[in-house]
Amino acid sequence: MKKQSIYLLMLTVILLMGCNQDAPKYIIGVSQCSVDIWHDWQNAEMKTEANFHEGIELRFADANSDPEVQSKQIDSLVASGINLLIVTPNQLSSSSPAIDRAHDKGIPVIVFERKTESRKYTAFVSADNYEMGHMMGEYIASRLGGKGNIIEVMGPKGSKPAEERYNGFHVAIADYPDIKVVAEIEGDWTEDTAYETVKKWEGDLNTVDAVFGHNDRSALGARKAFKERGARMPLLCGIDALPGPDGGIHKVAEGQLDASYIYPTRGDELIKLAIAILDGDRYPKETMLSSALVTHDNAMVLQLGSDEVVRMTQNLNKLQAKANGYKQQIATQQTVWILVGVSAVLLLLSIVLAILYFRSKRLAQKQS
């Protein structure tokens, strides 16, 4: 009886300690096709927004631009027990089957930026990549006066955003017969690759009047190549216009880029949408995010606003970290008090059992 009572109390302690740990209400898996400044900012926005909601756990996976890796990571996230999947697909031909498998298992899927081939998703969020390319084409044509040579540093083959930006750009400049794209260079969204490929281009960089990078890092990599080869600096335009000291807004304000186009990350909206889906609330099936051109004319104003957003986000994250620390301290204190209480009960039970044992022993001796 003594051992059974002790085991029962130990089980009670374990259960109480388990109850003391708050289980997440929702587990949201995030599958990013690559790691870069743009996706880092989106992840940070998701983390900040999740802090405003009780019981949200985020699980991130980064495929480092490898579609096969992303497919495996999606399957792994699903197997880990997530309640919803947010995914930015790499190459749709490779990623779509894994997304379909998640959807077929009843897991809601939010697809960002690229629609899957099967359309098996719960919601889709993106900006208009075709419009971005078209607007950049019009802007560059206007700045060049309808005449000049352009190097285009594209995104990787198979990338839907790169394809749409390319199409929009070329439709825009088709109206200007004296504008020539003298080189179409495939990149991978990184500054280093753009730098290496532009530097190795066999043409005369001094004949180039403009560079259109499919993102800001590509345009900045081209800028580095022009500078290293001692060539005349062309008009430099990209897409993303992220906030922060390394973002495109700052680069335009500082004069390193001539223009960029805001490609909104909106990680906060993705989390809000995810919670609405999980809570059973009404939500839009498709959301198109608004964007805008950033030039020297508006970059300083946008920079001031974006700097304030960055500062507030950092402060909120610090406050959340402190709050989590206090919460953990309280949970630890509660656990300690539970252990003290149970220890006291165990001690009291041991005393009672000892008294009963000696009484029964004494009674047995008298009877004998």
What kind of region is each of these model predictions?
Residues 70, 125-150, 193-195, 219, ...:
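Hydrophobic alpha-helical segments within soluble ligand-binding/sensing domains
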Residues 27-49, 53, 58-71, 88-92, ...:
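Extracytoplasmic "Venus flytrap"
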Residues 50-63, 150-152, 173-191:
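Short beta-strand elements in bilobed, periplasmic/extracellular small-molecule ligand-binding domains
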Residues 7-16:
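Bacterial N-terminal signal peptides
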Residues 92-131, 142, 149, 155, ...:
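Flexible loop/hinge segments that line or gate small-molecule binding clefts
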Residues 19, 157, 161, 172-173, ...:
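Hinge/cleft segment of the Venus flytrap/periplasmic-binding protein
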Residues 28, 32, 46, 134-177, ...:
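An alpha-beta-alpha
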